[in-house]
Amino acid sequence: MPSQKKILVVTQHFWPENFRINDIVEGFLQDGIAVDVLCGLPNYPKGEWFPGYSAAGPFEEEWHGARLYRCKEVPRRGNTSVNIFLNYVSWPWYAAHALHRLPGGYDAVFCFNTSPVLMCWPAIRYAKKHHIPFTNYVLDIWPENLYSVLNVKNKALRAIAQGVSDALYKKADRLIAMSEPLQQRLCQRTGMPPQK
């Protein structure tokens, strides 16, 4: 009898926040796949902790049979440019430094990559260290999405943001896009064939 497959899902936003990744994880579980989720502390969209959550946790929970490993993040309080920026960089940093908390034994890593593109950094680190495939489900393309939130006019900063974004997208073994135009744009940016 084959052993049960096990997936690590990496996503800043997860239940009780209302994102499609909740349904995707339920689908994995219904297919008999064991799932651990590395996620943040719920505060989206208002930047206020959901009831029962705070900067002090909880950092481990169970949801429908999936084990949740929550990481710290700076909440988006007030949705100011500064707080959004701090939220964008804090969660990937804390998540990348919490990988040692995970029990391991995963067959693959699946990242639900909303903004920022940096969210996939912990997934890349884990997949590379453990030599397992990494799938990046891309919802927002960067740095274009960044420019819709922050007014970045400096050409050097824009070039750096483009280079970092492209490098992170190229680290995936498989890219999944939300739409056909987004898939075409990712293929154009990364040089990956459409079936990837």
Predicted regions and their residues:
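Helix-loop-beta element that forms the nucleotide-linked donor phosphate-binding surface
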Residues: I176-A177, Q183-K196
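N-terminal subdomain of nucleotide-sugar transferases
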Residues: M1-H64
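Hydrophobic anchor at the start of a short beta-strand
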Residues: V35, F134, P194-Q195
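A conserved catalytic-core segment of Leloir-type glycosyltransferases
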Residues: C39-P103
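An aromatic- and histidine-rich active-site surface loop
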Residues: N18, F85-A96, A108-N145
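Short beta-strand scaffold positions
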Residues: C111, A177-M178
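Structural motif
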Residues: K6, D107-A108, R174
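Membrane-proximal helix-turn-helix segments that form the acceptor-binding/catalytic region
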Residues: L118, R125-H130, K155-A177
